[in-house]
Structures are given as structure tokens and as C-alpha cells.
């Protein structure tokens, strides 16, 4: 089913992520979570439609704005709902809208300036996209940043990889929970900015129906949620969502890939804002980590 051209009934009016407030970048404060959209295509992608990802994720997020709409807290699994206090979410979550279309150089310059300013202000950028073609631009806005990548193709051996797509280069091994957590703690340098790339391909094949790069194996939803919750407890400067192509056939009006990404992203948001988080989360299953 193609992405609806008109908003769903609950989305009348201005469409923002989880119905968050709109802000100008000059009004971003320390501790804010700042949503920004990248409605662009990867020219090397096998299918067109990645530019629709930012809108699709915003549409889906409306159903997760349970601080305003408690009956729609978790459309994937109602049992996954956590009873936590989210006082202050509306004040700290904001949406800047999308980067405007234009020449590649102008897009990259605008994005780099925006991410750099958000990071300098002590806020965290949530970048909604389908294409990962601008991920290097995001990295360049945060000099000497470390990158943690969930899914996707490994590009740098120095990055921390969770369930990467096989490319014939990375060495992938099975590690127990304690070793995984120890490796993340050893890898993380708190003096450097932290960039998280969250690609839809991190999910197991049966779940990633809207992904242009299907894969064998992968994580279930609970495991991805736990990883993002764990990463969110670090001072992440930016997280970028990639790999989503809403034009591919999916399941239902609010498609499965969109629901998975927003469900998992909520764990990151709550952890980053320190909502109901008293200690580091622990993973309960084995997972693939590239070393």
C-alpha cells in the first residue's frame, strides 16, 4: 500500500514528531531533543521512496504520543508499555521541520550547520531519514565523534557495530551480555561526541519488510529497544534513522517498519531524557557485535 498522501485522521493540523512543539534552531536549549527531517533519496538505492521516510515516521509517531494520547501508547505490543513519568517531555522535545530541498552542497552545508549548533547547545538531534547518504555530513559536524551503528553496512572498524549487515570485511562474533556491555564501556570515550546510526536492517528479516537491504538474521524488537535504551543513557549528540522506504509494500496503514523504528526510538528518547531510568539497562540475549 503506498504512503497516504493526506494525513491520517488524528493528524489534522501541523504534523510534528509525537505532536511536539515547533521551534527555531536559535531557541534550542541544553538538554532538548531536537527532531529534524531529511527527505532525500539515495541515488544508489534499488528502490525510490526513501525521501518519504521523515513524513512517515512523524505520522507514525502521533500514535505514540501517549503523553497526549494514552490509548495509543504502543501499537506494536501493548504489553511493552512502561509505566514511567514523562513530565517535561513536551518542554524538551521539539521539531525543527525538514531540511529544504536544493543543490547537494547547500543541503550538506545547512545540515552540518544545524547539527553543529544543536550539539554546541548541549542538545541531541534526532534525524529522521531513509537514506544514509548524509550520515558522513552529520559526522563531520561533530569533530572526532564516535559512531555506534545498529544494522547497516560497516564502514569504519573503529565504530561500535550491533548486528551489522555482512559485507565480507567485518569480523562478526557472538558475545555474551557481560562481554558486550564491557566492550561498549571500553570503547566509549566520554570526551568525544557520540553519534548513533539506527538502520532498519538491524531487525530480523521477518520484521524489516520496508527495508531496501533485507538480511538474514538480525535482532528482535526487544533487543533493539534494550540497545537503544543503553545507548540513550550516554550523552548522545545525534541519532540518525536510516534504511526505511515507506513506498515498499508493508502491513497496514501504520506500516510495520515505521512502527518498529518509532517503538525502539521511544526507548532511546526516554533514556536520553532520564525518564524512569535508574541504572544501565542490560541485554538479555546474545547478539552480534562487530569487532
Predicted regions and their residues:
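Short His-Asn-centered micro-motif
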Residues: 128-130, 150-151
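Short, charged/polar "capping" segments at the starts of alpha-helices
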Residues: 155-160, 249
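Catalytic cores of soluble, metal-dependent hydrolases
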Residues: 2-34, 40, 46-48, 52-125, ...
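A domain-level signal for caspase-like cysteine endopeptidase catalytic cores
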Residues: 160-167
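Acidic, His- and aromatic-enriched active-site or binding-groove loops in soluble protein domains
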Residues: 144-155
Amino acid at each position: 500500500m503506498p504512503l497516504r498522501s493526506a494525513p491520517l485522521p488524528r493528524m489534522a493540523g501541523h504534523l510534528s514528531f509525537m505532536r511536539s512543539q515547533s521551534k527555531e534552531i536559535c531557541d534550542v536549549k541544553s538538554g532538548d531533543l531536537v527532531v529534524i527531517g531529511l527527505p532525500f533519496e539515495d541515488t544508489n538505492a534499488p528502490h525510490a521512496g526513501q525521501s518519504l521516510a521523515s513524513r512517515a515516521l512523524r505520522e507514525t509517531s502521533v500514535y505514540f504520543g501517549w503523553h497526549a494520547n494514552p490509548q495509543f501508547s504502543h501499537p506494536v505490543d501493548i504489553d511493552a508499555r512502561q509505566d514511567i513519568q514523562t513530565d517535561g517531555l513536551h518542554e524538551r522535545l521539539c521539531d525543527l521541520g525538514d531540511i529544504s530541498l536544493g543543490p547537494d552542497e547547500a543541503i550538506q552545508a545547512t545540515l552540518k550547520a544545524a547539527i553543529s549548533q544543536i550539539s554546541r547547545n548541549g542538545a541531541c538531534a534526532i534525524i529522521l531519514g531513509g537514506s544514509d547518504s548524509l550520515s558522513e555530513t552529520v559526522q563531520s559536524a561533530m569533530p572526532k565523534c564516535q559512531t555506534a551503528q545498529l544494522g547497516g553496512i560497516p564502514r569504519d572498524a573503529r565504530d561500535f557495530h550491533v548486528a551489522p549487515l555482512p559485507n565480507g570485511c567485518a569480523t562478526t562474533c557472538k558475545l555474551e551480555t557481560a562481554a558486550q556491555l564491557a566492550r561498549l564501556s571500553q570503547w566509549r570515550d566520554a570526551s568525544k561526541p557520540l553519534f548513533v546510526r539506527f538502520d532498519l536492517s538491524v531487525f530480523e528479516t521477518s520484521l524489516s519488510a520496508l527495508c531496501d537491504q533485507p538480511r538474514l538474521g538480525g535482532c528482535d524488537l526487544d533487543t533493539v529497544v534494550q540497545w537503544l535504551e543503553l545507548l540513550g543513557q550516554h550523552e548522545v549528540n545525534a541519532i540518525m534513522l536510516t534504511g526505511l522506504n515507506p513506498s515498499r509494500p508493508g502491513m497496514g496503514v501504520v506500516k510495520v517498519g515505521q512502527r518498529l523504528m518509532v517503538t525502539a526510538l521511544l526507548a532511546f528518547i526516554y533514556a536520553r531524557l532520564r525518564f524512569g531510568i535508574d541504572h544501565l539497562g542490560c541485554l538479555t540475549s546474545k547478539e552480534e557485535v562487530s569487532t
